Amino acid sequence: MAERSAPVGVMDSGVGGLSVLAEIQRLLPSESLLYVADCGHVPYGEKTPDYIRQRCRRIAEFFQAQGAKAMVLACNTATVAAVADLRERYPDWPLVGMEPAVKPAAAATRSGVVGVLATTGTLQSAKFAALLDRFANDVRVVTQPCPGLVELIETGDLGSLQLRQLLLGYVQPLLAAGCDTLILGCTHYPFLRPLLAGMVPADVAIIDTGAAVARQLKRLLAARELLADGPARDAAFWSSADPRSLENILPVLWNTSGSVQRLQL
């Protein structure tokens, strides 16, 4: 039985999961957090499901070895490929995944047209198709795969002309289709909100699922009486690539500097 003071493991293919980590820290400030950025294998969106499953299994084993009381897959593509496999392997371990916010977007739209920005892997998945079948019968959903966005966000330069032009090229067709609600279907994309705000009309809603994931984690921990009640330890970071890259980005995306350890899996 895990202890209340045990940490929560959060993983992503790279730095995108920091957007989810921030929501978890905001809602659950007493929780100690471990973060693995699988930067040596980014982007997951262009990898095969089996490849992603193998990566997630190794990271789950690492979190288990660290004594983590729960694991969050802060990556839509990893959730699609691996969450069912991990739940089968660890039936008693709280696992939280990500999925595009189709349900709240379908409820929020006024035009009846919802746009989705996501990776190719997420948009082509059976899990995403099932979400549309379940929640989007009464709206039109326009999808936009976004190759290249994750890699540019990974550099930490969120104001670059290249990033701005690429994002604009993905957003314009959605607006032209009449979308008044945009789903950010990748955990990297919330870092683009300031850019998006300058590209879309003020009445276009932008929706992501980071806060919902934090709430689900809280529910799972509370149900098992595992919510921490003491002061949290500082978040610990690992990267499967050069740690200096993540260390340089942390002040930009996490608003705090920190040391990053190299993780070879």
Swiss-Prot record:
Annotated keywords: Cell shape, Cell wall biogenesis/degradation, Isomerase, Peptidoglycan synthesis
Catalytic residues (UniProt): C75, C186
Binding site for substrate: D12, S13, Y44, G45, N76, T77, T187, H188
InterPro entries linked to this entry: Asp/Glu/hydantoin_racemase, Asp/Glu_race, Asp/Glu_racemase_AS_1, Asp/Glu_racemase_AS_2, Glu_race
Gene3D superfamilies reported for this sequence: 3.40.50.1860
Signal peptide: none
NCBIfam families, sorted: glut_race
Protein name per Swiss-Prot or TrEMBL: Glutamate racemase
Organism: Pseudomonas putida (strain W619)
Primary gene name: murI
